[in-house]
């Protein structure tokens, strides 16, 4: 049975083929959203609900480094969820470093900037969600993953100061996925908790069993906001 929390909103999700991406799409469908799955490769996403029925979802293929090609699509979305990523685990070579920064940080930043710059002539509700993970403030036992996600988190804090609409940060604990086969949280429950917190109006969305995350992340977010506000200038109109 559908609710109406996101009724009529067109929502795009990157990393839509992953466990959390699919779980989030299912939760958004239950809230009445029109779904767009942004994923690498040309295969259409086949998404089913708990009863096994197919969920209508538009699949759009894209590649890291080619974000500009999504400009027209992004202008037609009310909500963009930046959720894609890569985890090279214990690697520390040149290519692993490049990939981690390109996929986890720079690609996400390019999408963020494109969405923030897209026109909104009708004054519709618009917002962007960025999955930075609790690696922002806690060890993930994957140094390059931590570095790339923490850098993304810093940039999200900076760009949020001048954003024309809400930028929500998703700080998620270890759920089972291809990126983290050792995760113990269920992606479906994590996605349900994310949607519930967004509907409650939270911009800092935390889903984690780790009490340190709940303590450190709000402090980090507040500290960055104050620091960036004090030592940076507003952009020229």
Model-derived features: where do they sit?
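Rossmann-fold scaffold of SDR-type NAD(P)-dependent oxidoreductases
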Residues: 14, 77-86, 104, 130
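Catalytic loop of short-chain dehydrogenase/reductase
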Residues: 89-90, 120-161, 174-179
């Amino acid at each position: 049975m559908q609710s109406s929390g996101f009724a009529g909103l067109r929502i795009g999700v990157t990393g839509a083929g992953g466990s959390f991406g699919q779980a989030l799409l299912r939760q958004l469908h239950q809230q009445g959203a029109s779904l767009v799955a942004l994923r690498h490769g040309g295969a259409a996403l086949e998404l089913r609900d708990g009863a096994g029925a197919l969920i209508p979802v538009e699949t759009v293929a894209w590649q890291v480094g080619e974000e500009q090609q999504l400009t027209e699509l992004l202008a037609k979305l009310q909500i963009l969820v930046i959720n894609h990523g890569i985890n090279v685990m214990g690697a520390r070579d040149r290519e692993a470093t490049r990939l981690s920064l390109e996929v986890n940080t720079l690609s996400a930043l390019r999408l963020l900037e494109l969405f923030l710059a897209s026109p909104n002539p009708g004054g519709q509700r618009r917002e962007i969600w960025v999955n930075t993970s609790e690696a922002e403030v806690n060890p993930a036992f994957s140094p390059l993953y931590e570095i790339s996600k923490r850098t993304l988190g810093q940039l999200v804090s900076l760009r949020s100061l001048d954003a024309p609409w809400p930028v929500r940060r998703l700080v998620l604990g270890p759920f089972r996925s291809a990126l983290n086969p050792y995760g113990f949280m269920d992606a479906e429950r994590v996605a349900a908790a994310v949607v519930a917190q967004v509907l409650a109006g939270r911009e800092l969305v935390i889903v984690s069993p780790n009490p340190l995350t709940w303590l450190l992340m709000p402090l980090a977010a507040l500290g960055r906001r104050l620091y960036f506000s004090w030592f940076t200038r507003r952009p020229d109109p």
